[in-house]
Every structure is written in C-alpha cells, then in structure tokens.
C-alpha cells in the first residue's frame, strides 16, 4: 500500500503504499482547468483493449423509466375491450386513466430533458475557463461528445510518455541515451548523443548495440522483454519469458549479448533454463551478480562458470532480493543488492523470514504457483502461503552483508547503537567512495532514524546521525531511496565527501547537505512553507548545483528548481508564472534532462540543455497530438480548484463540474478520495479518469479533498493522524461535504463517496462517522476494515504496534454497524486473491453486519483477482458496477428496495380500481 505520494498507487486502485507524487492548487476558488489524476498506478498497465461495445447506448442505459412502463400497453388494451361491453362509464374511466398516464409520462419526459445531461462543453472552452473570474466557473453552448467508460479503461485518455535511459559514455561522456525500437538500419537498440538529434552535427553518430529485436541462441529465438547495456556499452543483458511475482518483482531467463558479434549466451551457461530473480552489471562491466532461488551468484564474463556467493537461501532466507513486505512497503522495487562504485564489493540484504507467520491466498481458477496438481486433486484451489507480518507479529530479520569480490568472501560489520534484530528496518543503502557506505535504518515503528557509516576496507562502522522524529513533531520516517552522495573535490570547494538528504525542517520536508560523511549537523539548502519531492533529482558536481522538484508555488503543483550547494541562488527551471506539474530526469553529468510537463494542459516532453544560466530546449520528443484532438472533440468536465479551511487547516479541493454546468440546477455529488498518509489526489496533472467520466457522461459533480494526513501541506497537518487513522481524515471529508451540501447547485439528498484500498477504508470510515447525516451512499473497493489485518511495516509506521496503541486500533476499526445502517445503501467489492489487503477485511466486516442485522449493502467478489482486480475481465466489471450502482443510487432505486414487500401486478390493481368505481 505504499503511497506517500508521488509514486505507486495513483489510480482509483491505490495500492496502499503508494507512493509519492504531487502538484499545486491556486489560492482562490476561481481557478478552473482540465487537469486530473491518472487512472492507472505506475506499475499498472492500462486494460489491454477497449472492452468492445455496449449492449445499450449511454442514453438508453441511463434513461429514466418509470417502473412497469414497458408493460402497460397490453393489459390496458385488454381492459379497454372488456369495458366497451360494460357501458360508457367504464370507457370514461378508461380514457381518464389513459390521459393521466399520458400526462405523467409527458411530465417525466420534460423533467428528464431539463434535469438530465446538458449540452456538452468542448475541451477548448474548458481550457479558456482556466482564468475565469467567476467562482462558478464558465459554461459553453458548444457541443462535444461525452467521455466514455470504455475510453477510460482502455487507456485512450492516457498521455504518452517516453522513458529515456540516460547512460554515461565509456569515457564519462554526458548526454548519451539508450533508445529502443526502429528498423534494422537504425538498429533495435542504440545509443544516441542528444546533440545529434537536431541533425546538425553528423560527427556524433548513433552506436548500434542490437541490430534486431530477436536473438537466436542454439536455434532458439529469444525475444527480450527488457534490456540493460553494460557501462562500457560492449555487452547487453537481456531478459526473456518474464513472469510477474508481486508488485515489483519478477523472474525470467537472462542472456548476455555481445555487441561486436551480435550473439548471445545464457547468463549461466550451466543452467540456461534457470529462472533468475535479479541481475545487475558490475560498474566495471566485467561481471554480473544475480539471484536465483534466493541465492546470490557471480558470473565473471571471462569465464562460463558462476560463483555461488551464498548457498543457504531458500524458502525462509532471501539474499539480494526483498521479501513481500520489504518489496511492498520499504524498497518499492525488486533489488536489495548494491555494487560499490569501484566494483570491489557487493552489499546485499540477508532476509530471514523463519519467524514470520504465513497467510494463505487461494486461487480458484489460475495456478500462479506453477505446480501441477496430482491426479484427483485438480478441483482443489491453488494456495500460495505468503510470509506476511501483520501488526504485532514477528517481522523479517534483515541484516546488511558484504561480499569481497577479489577475496570471494562474505562478511558483516557490527555497529554499536544498532537497533535490535526485531526492531530494525533498513530503508536505504548508499555507497560513497573508498569502500565506505551509508546505511539509513529506523526502528520498527519508524519514528527514530539512525544513519551509520561503514568502512568495508577496515570492516568497522559507527553511528553518525540520529533523529527522534516522534519527539520532534509526533511524526514518522517515510522510507525513501533518494539520498545523494557528493564526493570531495577541493578544486570546487568540497574538501570532504558528503551527502544530501531530506529532513524535517520547521514543519516541512527540506534538503540538507551533510559533509563530512560523519557530520551530524546539516547545511540547509532549502527552507520555507513548502516541501521538496523525492529530492534531490540530481547534483551537478562541476558547478555545485543541486536540482530538485518542489511545491514552492502551491501544494498541488510541481516545478523544477536548482540551488547552489551552499544554499544560495535558488531558482526555478520551469515557468512558475502559471500552474504546472513537472517531472524531470537528468543525464549522467546533469548537462541535459528530459523535462516532462504533466499538466494542467496537454502533457509534453522535451530534452533541455542545463549548461547555461538559462535552459534551452534541444528537442521536443512528445506533444501528445492525438490527445489534443480528443480534447477538442470531447466534452470534458470543468475543474475548479479551491481551498477549504477545516479546524484551522487549509485543505486542497478540486470540483469537477459537468460540461455546460448550470448553477440554477441541483446536481448529485460524488466524493472521491484516497487519503493515505503522505498521499496526494488533488494535483494539477492532466487526467481523464473515472471521475471525469462520471462528470462528463453521467452529469454528476465530483469533489475530491485532500484532508489531514495527506502530503505536501506541512508536517503538522500530516502527522496529526498518527495513532488514530481515519478519524481526522473522515472528519475533513464530512466537513467539506457539508459545505457542498449547502451550495445552491447541489442536491444534498444525493451525495455519495467512494475510494479504493486506503480510499475504501476511508469510504467506510466516513460513512461510519457520518451515520447518514451527510452522505447517503458509499462505494468501497478492496478496503481495510481493521488495521490489525494489514501488514506490519506500513501499519505500525502510522499506528504504532497494537501492543503500544490498542485503543487506537480499536478506534480505527470499522465497528459501528448501527451507524452504517443509517446510510441508504453502500457497496463493497474485493478481489478474492488480494495478497495486499486480504479478503479477510471484507469477510470480517460482513460478519459484523450479519450479527447486527444490517442489510443495506451490496457485496461483490472477484475470483483470482489481486489488489488491482484485473483477472478475467474483472477490472472492466468493477468500473461498470461502480457506474451502474451509482446511477441507481442517484436515481433513487435503493430507496425502493430498502424494505421490499410483495406487489400485485398493475393489471390486478386496475381491476380492483374499476371495481371500486363501479356503482
């Protein structure tokens, strides 16, 4: 569930970790634009197809029909024939009833036309509304097609982004990038000099690494799914037959490709079919370290043999790769192996899961274990026993070990003042120079940080820095891997090695420079009531410049800045005169960068030159022309960014209004939230997602507020939720909803809330706290319902252990079934094979509802689906269910089924009425 924001979890499916990401909102309520949040999380691929056509057009599917309307004609005709033989009185009654029905139908039809979908505003008009002075936004009489759910799920509204693989040249040249694709003449895999892309410098030609996308080895065709060139660009590491494991991890067959001969061989020639979990180039390009069956191996390219670095890895011991909880909640990746810069040492984790309890995840259709059942056992589910530590249970014991490449020796270094084995979480490892390495660790509850400096040559270590974050502001340490080593360079004013880290400073997260490496006192590079994001992005060692992304302009924006290494001359690289959301990826020497503009207008990407005082644009590599055409053709919602104040805290809000919004009408309102600690959902990225579809096609208002606990609004607002997840967050949702309910254009009797993962928990917690007073409906997907059921590392970071905070866990659990029963109705959906938020959460909730005789809910399970709910078309089904359920809610259908009673047919009611009218 790693989401602390800016990374994972940025779709409606927000895995709970997520991640970290950002953007900035205006300080007024008059700003509207077209930005939204991306539907799909970083590691999540869009649904691979458009899901085909619908059985009914949108107008048919959501058309209001009176119950029984289609069945009226035949009984009516029959009764009229009978009445004809009975005299004029019956005929008069018949025609009176016909006229009444016709009048009712006409009235309903008029109401449908005036209260249904309005004319659609084009995207260009919505873009013009960006500078609107009216707090109500702007409207347009122009027409445009509504956004469809098929488009959203099929990824048609996703911007195109290119990932550039910057590499250093063999002679440390800057501005080189790896590009994949193209014909045989261009080369499938090549290294380009960015300065040659303009076509005015023929002296810098591309170097082709692979001519073809398919490689043949002993008559076998190898189709690589990913490639990694060696640092000297003479070899390429290939992976084929890649299979996903968990969110970030995978296995595959690895091959070493020789550039000169254009031939390949297995990474381990003695075991060509062995599935490898991880492979990493040596900085010297002469060896590859890899993990197979949880053991580390070294392959020197000068030999076909491999050296076993470890031998006892297996089911309970992991070497070089993380276990489930470290992969999900700490590293956000598949590697815990690090080469030293001089290629003399390898650092790696030894993870002991012996004491970690197992949780069974069942699969009823697929067999992800790959095990073929014995004859007669085919009808039993496939069960994966996951070592999954829950709060208060034993955690994996993780140690840092080292391998001396020359001596072929594994060793560890004992450090005084280290955390105990059961109280240690290693969150970052960073090699410095001359065999020195920095290690950042926290205690189990993630509120004490310790930084150690280890010398692998002398095999000694010491504590160099410690921070009691809980004592500072009641907060926690968020795991990150963005610390940067800054080597000594006396000629450039750096007499000692140092590093740049992100630290809490006056209530916000800022950049600090520590030098020498053992200096506990920092030189602050940034300060103020704003925060840096995953910083620093890069360090220019020649000019002493630090590049970073920050929220200096507003919490919902991201701009790129640079500052001198002494903390002076902080300046933006991007245009801060208007709202923007940028990301950046720098070349090896920081002379060039890939600048990505993500919103609020149409996203684009460009290569920039940072050598001078002013940046220059080298090449525009993506302008999303197709997306521009779609924006012009479709009626996107107008987005109004504003702030609200709740209990003295300023919170960011975005309101998505239907096209051609009419303030004289009354609109239903859907609140969408995630709300996890450090996350962000209100930002200035261009996004067309499920919320956009709801506003554009269904005609409802969608509101999102980032309440207390979320990121980039200061540590005071963020840390207040610690130990009591859900309380302040739900309070802020309800308080904001009450503000919207009081607006003249809102129908306060039709308000709903929905979310996924942590957002699912927040949906239920909000309904529980609200008890039907503000929200009538809710939709929770893959929710946590009791934090004792989630994983230990994430949960204890924000809740402490259950032993230290039993009341907090009780308060955060969904327990008040009577309060939930006050809602009109709510929906809960869950993947039956969710390895992240276990199905246990929803099943225990259902049991509580049963025991309390609560029936005002619907539930849906998806077999073999994990937290993202994708298996066998499930992702499409989830969103169609959400859409249909919401329409039924706002159409009043759930009121009709609250207390069902048998009903006689209309024909029987008619006959009874006629008898009563007879003399």
UniProtKB/Swiss-Prot annotation:
GO biological process: proteolysis
GO molecular function: aminopeptidase activity; dipeptidyl-peptidase activity; serine-type peptidase activity
Topological region Cytoplasmic: 1-92
Presence of keyword Cytoplasm: no
EC number: 3.4.14.5
Recorded topology in the membrane: Single-pass type II membrane protein
Places the protein is found: Vacuole membrane
UniProt entry keywords in alphabetical sequence: Aminopeptidase, Glycoprotein, Hydrolase, Membrane, Protease, Serine protease, Signal-anchor, Transmembrane, Transmembrane helix, Vacuole
InterPro entries for this protein: AB_hydrolase_fold, Peptidase_S9_cat, Peptidase_S9B_N, Serine_Prot_S9B/DPPIV
Transmembrane segments: 93-113
Residues modified by glycosylation: 200, 352, 643, 811
Catalytic activity: Release of an N-terminal dipeptide, Xaa-Yaa-|-Zaa-, from a polypeptide, preferentially when Yaa is Pro, provided Zaa is neither Pro nor hydroxyproline
Descriptive protein name: Probable dipeptidyl-aminopeptidase B
Originating species: Aspergillus fumigatus (strain CBS 144.89 / FGSC A1163 / CEA10) (Neosartorya fumigata)
Classification lineage: Eukaryota, Fungi, Dikarya, Ascomycota, Pezizomycotina
């Amino acid at each position: 569930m790693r989401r602390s924001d800016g990374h994972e979890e940025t779709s409606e499916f927000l895995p709970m970790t997520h991640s970290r990401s950002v953007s900035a909102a205006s300080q007024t309520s008059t700003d509207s634009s077209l930005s939204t949040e991306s539907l799909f999380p970083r590691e999540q691929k869009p649904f691979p197809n458009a899901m085909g056509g619908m059985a009914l057009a949108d107008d048919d599917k959501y058309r209001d029909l009176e119950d029984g309307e289609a069945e009226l004609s035949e009984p009516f005709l029959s009764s009229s024939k009978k009445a004809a033989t009975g005299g004029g009185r019956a005929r008069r009654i018949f025609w009176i009833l016909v006229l009444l029905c016709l009048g009712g139908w006409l009235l309903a039809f008029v109401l449908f036309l005036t209260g249904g979908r309005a004319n659609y505003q084009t995207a260009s008009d919505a873009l013009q509304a960006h500078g609107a002075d009216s707090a109500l936004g702007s409207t347009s009489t122009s027409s445009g097609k509504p956004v469809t759910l098929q488009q959203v799920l099929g990824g048609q509204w996703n911007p195109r982004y290119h990932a550039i693989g910057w590499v250093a040249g063999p002679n440390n040249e800057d501005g080189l990038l790896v590009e994949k694709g193209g014909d045989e003449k261009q080369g499938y895999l090549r290294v380009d000099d960015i300065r040659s892309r303009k076509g005015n410098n023929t002296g810098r030609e591309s170097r082709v690494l692979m001519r073809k996308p398919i490689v043949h080895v002993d008559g076998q065709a190898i189709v690589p799914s990913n490639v990694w060139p060696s640092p000297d660009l003479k070899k390429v590491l290939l992976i084929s037959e890649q299979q996903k494991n968990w969110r970030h991890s995978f296995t595959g067959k690895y091959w070493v490709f020789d550039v000169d001969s254009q031939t390949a061989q297995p990474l381990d020639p003695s075991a060509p079919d062995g599935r490898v979990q991880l492979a990493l180039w040596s900085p010297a390009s002469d060896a590859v370290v890899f993990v197979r069956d949880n053991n580390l191996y070294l392959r020197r390219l000068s030999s076909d043999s491999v050296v076993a670095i470890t031998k006892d890895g297996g089911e309970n011991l992991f070497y070089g790769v993380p276990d489930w909880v470290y992969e999900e909640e700490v590293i956000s990746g598949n590697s815990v192996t690090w080469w030293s810069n001089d290629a003399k040492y390898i650092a790696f984790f030894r993870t002991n899961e012996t004491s970690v309890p197992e949780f069974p995840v069942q699969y009823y259709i697929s067999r992800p274990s790959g095990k073929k059942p014995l004859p007669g056992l085919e009808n039993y589910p496939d069960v994966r026993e996951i070592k999954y530590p829950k709060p208060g249970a034993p955690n994996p014991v993780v140690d840092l070990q080292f391998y001396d490449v020359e001596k072929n020796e594994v060793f560890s270094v004992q450090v005084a003042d280290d955390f105990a084995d059961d109280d240690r979480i290693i969150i970052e490892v960073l090699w410095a120079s001359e065999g020195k390495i920095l290690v950042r660790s926290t205690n189990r509850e993630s509120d004490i940080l310790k930084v150690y400096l280890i010398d692998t040559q002398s095999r000694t270590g010491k504590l160099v820095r410690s921070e009691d974050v809980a004592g500072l502001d009641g907060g926690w340490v968020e795991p990150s891997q963005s610390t940067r080593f800054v080597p000594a360079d006396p000629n450039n004013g750096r007499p000692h090695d140092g590093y740049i880290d992100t630290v809490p400073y006056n209530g916000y997260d800022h950049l600090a420079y520590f030098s020498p490496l053992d200096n506990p006192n920092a030189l602050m590079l940034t300060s103020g009531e704003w925060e840096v994001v995953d910083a620093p992005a890069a360090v220019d060692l020649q000019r002493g410049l630090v590049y970073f992304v920050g929220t200096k302009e507003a919490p919902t924006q991201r701009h790129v800045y640079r500052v001198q290494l002494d903390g002076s001359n902080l300046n933006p690289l991007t245009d801060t005169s208007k709202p923007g959301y940028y990301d950046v990826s720098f070349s090896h020497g920081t002379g060039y960068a890939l600048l990505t503009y993500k919103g609020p207008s149409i996203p684009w990407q460009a290569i920039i030159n940072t050598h001078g005082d002013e940046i220059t644009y080298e090449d525009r590599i993506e302008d999303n022309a197709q997306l521009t055409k779609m924006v012009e053709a479709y009626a996107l919602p107008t987005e109004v960014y504003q702030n609200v104040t709740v209990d003295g805290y300023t919170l960011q809000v975005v309101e998505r209004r239907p096209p051609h919004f009419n303030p004289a009408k009354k609109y239903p309102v859907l609140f969408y939230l995630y709300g996890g600690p450090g996350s962000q959902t209100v930002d200035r990225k261009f996004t067309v997602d499920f919320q956009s579809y709801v506003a554009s096609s269904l005609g409802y208002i969608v509101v999102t507020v980032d309440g207390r606990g979320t990121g980039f609004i200061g540590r005071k607002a963020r840390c207040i939720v610690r130990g009591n997840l859900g309380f302040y967050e739900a309070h802020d949702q309800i308080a904001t909803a009450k503000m919207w309910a009081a607006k003249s254009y809102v129908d306060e009797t039709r308000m709903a809330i929905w979310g996924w993962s942590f957002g699912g928990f927040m949906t239920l917690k909000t309904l529980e706290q609200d008890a039907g007073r503000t929200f009538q409906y809710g939709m929770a997907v893959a929710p946590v319902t009791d934090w004792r059921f989630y994983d230990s590392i994430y949960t204890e970071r924000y809740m402490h252990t259950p032993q230290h905070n039993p009341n907090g866990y009780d308060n955060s659990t969904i327990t008040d079934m009577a309060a939930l029963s006050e809602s009109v109705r709510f929906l809960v959906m869950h993947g039956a094979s969710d390895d992240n938020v276990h199905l246990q959460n929803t099943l225990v909730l259902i049991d509580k509802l049963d025991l309390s005789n609560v029936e005002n809910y619907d539930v849906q399970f998806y077999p073999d689906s994990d937290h993202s709910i994708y298996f066998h078309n499930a992702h499409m089904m989830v969103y169609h269910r959400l859409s249909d359920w919401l329409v039924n809610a706002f159409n009043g259908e759930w009121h009709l089924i609250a207390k069902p009673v048998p009903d006689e047919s209309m024909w029987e009611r008619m006959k009874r009425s006629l008898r009563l009218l007879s003399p």
